[in-house]
Amino acid sequence: MASGIARGRLAEERKSWRKNHPHGFVAKPETGQDGTVNLMVWHCTIPGKAGTDWEGGFFPLTMHFSEDYPSKPPKCKFPQGFFHPNVYPSGTVCLSILNEDYGWRPAITVKQILVGIQDLLDTPNPADPAQTDGYHLFCQDPVEYKKRVKLQSKQYPALV
């Protein structure tokens, strides 16, 4: 029964996204070689916000939904080794709205999650670090931190 709820909600999310989504963002369910759509895994792209050190980057993110969605949040992952204070070395994003014990609410949409992650890129939360490297540079060497962010943004150009 729960999987029916999850898939139904994700089908609605997909329909809503296709009608209206923020410029530069991509979010689509995984499609198999045979054309089947897997609503439980979405491949997304988050653009770096204009006017920030992240501008120009288009960052790939995968959202993994469980059968308990929307009671439980999706797991959101950048590529392994992604540089950011609130991204674990595995690529998993550490954000309050993705924490089922803290900020998650079933009403939160895919669009809200992706925009929240875009905001997090330029405004890290030093109170909730997930990787030592990004955290230390952000806190102790802002010039080097900005350099690393700009370099990473160049590593993820637009795919057009």
Curated annotation (Swiss-Prot):
Enzyme Commission identifier(s): 2.3.2.-
InterPro entries: Ub_conjugating_enzyme, UBQ-conjugat_E2_core, UBQ-conjugating_AS, UBQ-conjugating_enzyme/RWD
Single GO BP term: response to abscisic acid
A GO molecular-function descriptor: kinase binding
Location of N-acetylalanine modifications: 2
Coiled coil: none
SUPFAM superfamilies for the chain: UBC-like
Record-stated family: Belongs to the ubiquitin-conjugating enzyme family.
Source organism, top-level taxon: Eukaryota
GO CC list: cytosol; nucleus
Pathway in which the depicted protein is active: Protein modification; protein sumoylation
Function of the protein: SUMO-conjugating enzyme that accepts the SUMO proteins from the E1 SUMO-activating heterodimer SAE1/SAE2 and catalyzes its covalent attachment to other proteins with the E3 SUMO ligases SIZ1 and MMS21. Associates with SIZ1 for sumoylation of the transcription factor GTE3.
Class of this enzyme: transferase
Protein name: SUMO-conjugating enzyme SCE1
Catalytic residue list: 94 (glycyl thioester intermediate)
Recorded phenotype for the gene knockout or disruption: Embryonic lethal.
Annotated keywords: Acetylation, ATP-binding, Nucleotide-binding, Transferase, Ubl conjugation pathway
Pfam assignment, any one: UQ_con
Organism: Arabidopsis thaliana (Mouse-ear cress)
